[in-house]
Amino acid sequence: MKKIILPLEREIKQVKIEREKRDRKIISSDNWIYHDISQVREYEIVKECIQNILNNDTKILIRQIKGKLHSYKGQDKLKTLTEDENEFMNVTDVLKLLLDCNHKCYYCKTNVKLFYEKVREPIQWTLERLDNSFGHNMNNCVISCLKCNLSRRTMFHERYTLTKQLQNIIKKT
């Protein structure tokens, strides 16, 4: 009699195919000069935006923020999470959050990039909803890196924060 052994689900390893990272469309424009921009310069540009200083840098940053906010608003409408559109984040709210957090991810404390060149850049800034049953509102959002935002999924934010802190402690020892 022939014996067939089937592997258990946990024994099956998934092969992750590394895709080539694509450049964002914006970087092909002549206005894109942010290939190696420092964190300090990004911080200065945010301050200039808040002070209503209009120059090429602030215009591009504001356009980038508006683009993300438009996407977040679309997500919220699709999931019917925003009842009052006045509660939705605006550019000024995002700029204040970026200053308050000093461009650091809420969870892993990594410096987030405002000007990034690759699609799905892991350390690009995102607006993370603390409670996923509500939309991208001022009282419900923090700045996080894309990596933490995607890996948290629907986990309770305090639990995820604790997990990240423990990982940082383990790395240091």
Language model: regions and residue ranges:
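Mixed-charge, low-complexity interaction segments
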Residues: M1-D76, D93
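Residues that form generic nucleotide/phosphate-binding pockets
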Residues: I53, L97, T163
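Short, charged surface segments at domain edges that flank catalytic/cofactor-binding sites
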Residues: N56-Y107, S133
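Polyanion-binding and phosphate-handling cores
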Residues: L95, V112-F115, R152
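Short pre-active-site segment immediately N-terminal to redox-active cysteine/selenocysteine motifs
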Residues: K104, C141-S144
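Short, cysteine/histidine-rich loop/knuckle motifs that typically chelate Zn2+
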Residues: Y106-K109, K147
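Histidine-centered nuclease catalytic patch
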Residues: T110-C141
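Polybasic, low-complexity binding patches
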Residues: L130-V142, L150-T173
